[in-house]
Amino acid sequence: MALFRKFFLKKTPDRLLEISERVYVFDCCFSTDSMGEDEYRDYLSGIVAQLQDYFPDASFMVSNFWSGDKRSRISDILSEYDMTVMDYPQQYEGCPLLQLEMIHHFLKSCENWLSVEGQHNMLLMHCERGGWPVLAFMLAGLLLYRKTYTGEQKTLEMVYKQARRDFIQQFFPLNPQSSHMRYLHYITRQGSGPEKPPISRPLILDSIVLHVVPRFDAEGGCRPYLRVHGQDSSSSNKSAKVLYEMPKTKKHLQRYGQAEVPVKVGAFCRVQGDVVLECIHIGDNLDHEEIMFRVMFNTAFIQSNILGLNRDDIDVSWNSNNQFPRDFRAEVVFSDPGSFKPAAATVEEVDDDGDETDVASVDTGEEFYEAEEDWHDARRDPETQSTDGRTSIGDAELDGGVSREDSGSLEKHRADEDVKIVISQNLGCMSDRPVSAPAEILGNPGGLQQACENEEMPKLSNRSDQDDNAVQDIQVVAASVDSEGHKFGSICQKEDMKGVIAQTLVTAIDPSCSDEVQCQPDESAKILKYPNLDYTGFSSPRTLSSVDEDTRLGTIPNVALQNADVKIITESTVIVDNELVIYEEKTIVDNGNLTQEVKNVVNEESTTPKLDRSVIESVDSQDNKNHKMEVAKAADTTDSKMEQTKLKSGLEDAISLKKTTVQGSIVVLPATEIATKIKTKREESGGRRDVGISLPQSKIEARAKSPRISSDRRQIPDKVVPSKKMPVDHAPEAVLLEEKLGNSDQSQEQPKAVKPKTVRRWISPNKESETTSVHRPSHPPSRYDSSPAALAIHSMHTNNKFNVGKDAPLVSSGAQAVPKIQAAPPPPPPPPPPYASSSSLSMHMGSATKQQPPPPPPPPPLPPPPPPPASSGLSSIPPPPPPPPLMSFGAQTRTFVPPPPPPPPPPRSGVGGNTPPAPPPPPLRSTVPAISPPPPPPPPPLKPSSGAPCPPPPPPPPPPPPPSAPSSRAFSSAPPPPPPPPLLRSVPPPPPPPPISHSNAPPPPPLPAARFNAPPPPPPPPTTHFNAPPPPPPPPITRSGAPPSPPPPPSPPPPPPPPGARPGPPPPPPPPGARPGPPPPPPPPGGRPSAPPLPPPGGRASAPPPPPPPSTRLGAPPPPPPPGAGGRAPPPPPAPGGRLGGPPPPPPPGGRAPPPPRGPGAPPPPGGNPSSLIGRGRGVVRASGSGFGAAAARKSTLKPLHWIKVTRALQGSLWEELQRNDDSQSVSEFDLSELESLFPAAVPKPNDSSKSDSRRKSLGSKPEKVHLIELRRANNTEIMLTKVKMPLPDLVSAALALDQSTLDVDQVENLIKFCPTKEEMELLKNYTGDKENLGKCEQFFLELMKVPRMESKLRVFSFKIQFGSQVADLRKSLNTIDSSCDEIRSSLKLKEIMKKILLLGNTLNQGTARGAAVGFRLDSLLKLTDTRATNNKMTLMHYLCKVLAAKSSQLLDFYMDLVSLEATSKIQLKMLAEEMQAVSKGLEKVQLEYNASESDGPVSEIFREKLKEFTDNAGADVQSLSSLFSEVGKKADALIKYFGEDPVRCPFEQVISTLLTFVTMFRKAHEENRKQAELDKKRAEKEAEAEKSKAQLASKNDSKPSNPSRQVKQTPDTKTRAASRRGKDVG
């Protein structure tokens, strides 16, 4: 054995503990002693010398855990030996753990160090005093990380056991094992693969919910106080700090008892990374603090925004067993970072039928706020998660909720997502600050200030010379969240505008939104100058990055607002299936008064107001470069005052505006979806460019799904809001929105039609306007009941003036002038914009004074609602898909590819619906030398006479309508206000044209053909005065949200009339009081257009039919609906006389417009029940008949026999024989009638009230159980009750009788766990139905509720059951300790051995400072085994045993005197103290419940009797146990002092543990000495025998006589063999 040990036993260097291969720990880590400087240096030097001796070729790295802030002592010393020392802290915010990032660094560095090939690297672990807990954790983590061990619990406990049990308790008041286990789970979950730790996501720590109240005061309750430590995510400093601390006031620090669960303690703070949460109990005087528990976690591993905690998941004090029951449960609740609510502003949340609107009022009304968002390209990666980004500009913060995102992506909890509307207006002077909306102010000779942005953050300069009517700093910010979790937004700023509309749309999934929005331009866009127009760069961002904490609206600098009559119309929006829907109220700011008004009916009589011409152009390059919107405004309009209107406002602070003349300019940004592109037109320098945004004001309750257009393109719904009650001297200004799709490399000389991805909704011109919804669903559009579609408004450049009919919604279309009059090349086909309202008119900008109406394209998809009744239905129209690019743009080419007729308008009274975008129409071929405006975007304006250049359209070529003759005069359109549209001046409205006055026939834009295969109907003949308007948008889809694609027209319509034809002016508008109809459909070429009659939609019809034949009554001709899924189209609308009839689309010149065919399953004609369409897929109405398919298969009248059928008989089988015989099936032996009577098939019974009860009883059906309790908890309760097999009343009686024979402790604990909570009790108390119908769980709760404080009584019962065993165990343990103390002190043999050891030590240390000792510390006994002899075969312990065995053998069995020593080593006095305290407090609670039950009445009489008996006996037991505990404690302290130790530094457990270890090593050494002695004895005996045999053999050989004859004969070989034989014998 000794030889085996010599060769195979690996010896560990002294003073080092080997944890695993090449991993050692300094033994000073297990001691509480502190060494002096010299002693410490000697200690380390001795260890280093041993290491260099044992491992001469090894390299060493030391990981040191210490609490200093300078260079550690061990670093200074070991650096002299070329050892690398890594210093780590000992704790993180009071918890013996390190940050996850630091843990990962430690693990990776150690793994790399130990894994270097070809080198013998060793890792040494060291800690200073108090660092053992974190060192133990890091060791366990390293062993798990390297997969040396598996199992977190087992590994951690193994490392803990390297030190004595109470070692950690000396340094930390709380047991850190729970947090250690949590972080070990983090390590094992992460594995050894990733190079970096997981990214910790920011969260908002909302609150902590205690489902069980800890018992920390005399009454069994607590006063919780929270403190949160962690890193400040907003600071670059990584050091931790207190992130949240509750105020120490009576108001916040409330006491909670056991009956008040659950307790929710709020802690609203932002956390990220490693967080330490401390829950502290505050005494009644608010001064005393006692920590209840602590939790350390990392936010990277928080799932579902909840961290569940039980008794084993929290760090509690070492003696808190009774304070936290076994069923303790708590939850730390988080939310996404957007829910962080600073106190800068207030938020008012309105929840209306699922549509939530948060209106945040900015604190100061003198600042204009700007929201910014970070964007990324959604076209390339629509599914990608957006990244975090935030930029704050401005001084004020907008307080609201934050859109919730999971792991960077937005979760969509419902079809309709909430959208926030923030109204902000800059007032007064502001300090210079950069504005995120990229704009560059360029001065124009004509006074034009134009904002250009070229990927930089310009500043808006303040104009001190503004006139009193100048309105400055207009911002429109729109952002929406699509279903894929992306946000889009835009910022528009404008200076010196007379019509000011500031509207901010911020999307949020929940009603609270406080996102920080950043808008970053992607590409520079050119904004050319107009002499009298102001432009503001509008940046349309692409993707909203993950929303950060708050939304800050930065003020626009250096802007003064003077004398402004400003009208701000804001509309709440909702994202419904990737669509932006405007749905709630209008906010009007008038002369400093900000009010809000929500109307259910659009009813407004408006006079013709003067409006400045303003155009907002949104540019989004197809190559993900830039989004821009410009607001162009004529400066030459006259001033008009708004009528002051007060509306109810959700904003707390009114935005004060100075008096300014506002001409009703309205700007609304579209909320874009993934891959949304905003089309723009660019010009060469010096060229012009207009863009319009049409803003429908709408209110919706729409649900729709958004389709994915080819190339992942999306369409943006736009809104047209007519200004309310604004007198107009000339045509009101219109705002057009256009989107640009396609390449930006198109020719600058040829204007391209731009397809606006917008949907216009008609605003009824009634006095009280009702908002209608704009929504783009994801499927092909279908028709449903909704407001009529808005008309497209075309813009032309005319004398730099832009006139629009007042109160008419404007259609987005862009026009640009290039230096030469040329047809615009076809940009990518954008969907034509639907027209905003029945009264909306085409707008054109041009230099000519005359207006030439372009040929009207097919009627717009949706007709306006009948003027008299205000429509209450909510609907939204999606923008149609982009039309194909124009086929050709010849100078005089007059032929067009006929687009399909526009879809008919859906009935208007329907309540909610979304319209999908229609497919793009085929490319149009424009032949007129005048500009050919794209159907969706406004055609580029032409000034042939003046030679104004037509700017090239944006890269995506939407099919422009045929170019019209040059117009010399700005075309003005009169958009009607809500329902009764007042006729305005000279503007022909588009397809669902509103009544117009002084205007040419409105050109309805062609409807884009679905899938680009159906040619659009021919546009109306171009008028000589203005360009063709954009095509109308597709009709809204059915309520189900699935739009049918438009049916292809039976035959393409003939080409439009030649441009030379000049239509007459449209009929004059009806008087404002009259019920005006939409403009007439376009006349045939050469003819004068007549106003089409407006079909009054009557009832709520689902899908709009194709346009009916024109009737005498004015109405918007409804375009044909797009074909639905599967090519089915809605039926044509009824004749105009009908409820929803409308004029047919304009007939093509010389030909008839093809009526859209109605495929099977198409939506019924308008007037039908809208409910029939609800819930149908793809927006196609499926025919459902009760008898449909009934005859398809005959149903058996007999019950089926569920056997396994054999279809093929195997040869030789029974079935094969039966088949051969074929007589088994010939004649049936069974009576069919008898079978039908006995085994009839189950048939549904008619619901006859008179016989329903009897029939149900006959069928044996059970009444449905009513479940009030949460399903999972109810199921768990019922499972528990199945284990207690007795009726509920008997169960409660047994518990009250404290019957231990019926219920054991586990069953009682389960009953306690499933006692009803306070909320559940209230729920059951409020139930008024039949209690027999309640579920088993509810009945169990009701049974428990019959007894007051049943949970408390059950806890008393549980205590009573366990009391006897607890007292017996305590008494046994105390007696064991008492016996052990007596045995140790009375052992004479132990005393004699201690004396021998003292003599031995003094002998070894003679002449040194350690010599002449009068005693030694108890732990010096363990050093006997560390001191080895020079031959490494013996230690001092072996020597001691050898000497004792030789001279004092009677002492060798001294351990026989210490019989109780081993049992005592398993007992901890602290644990006994805790158990003793638990017994005492438990008995006190029993007494309290006994006293409280006096008032319970008869129900608790038996309980009180049983409890009285128990308390009398238990009191005596506890008293005697307390005295025994006190006596044992004194003996333990005396034993510690007996060995000369300090009870404070050396606890009783350490003394017992040291003595037991010494006894074990002594016995082991003695046994080894005995075995070695036996081996030596045997070896000696064997050697003696060998010597004896040698001697005998030698004497025998010498005694033999010699034989000369034989000697002569012997050869040399024989002599050699003999000699060798003799040698063997001797051996």
UniProtKB/Swiss-Prot annotation:
GO terms for molecular function: phosphoprotein phosphatase activity. The keyword Plastid does not apply. It comes from the Eukaryota. Residues 1600-1611 have a biased composition (Polar residues). Residues 370-413, 680-787, 801-1181, 1241-1261, 1571-1627 are annotated as: Disordered. Keywords: Hydrolase, Protein phosphatase. Belongs to the formin-like family. Class-II subfamily. This is Formin-like protein 5. The gene is FH5.
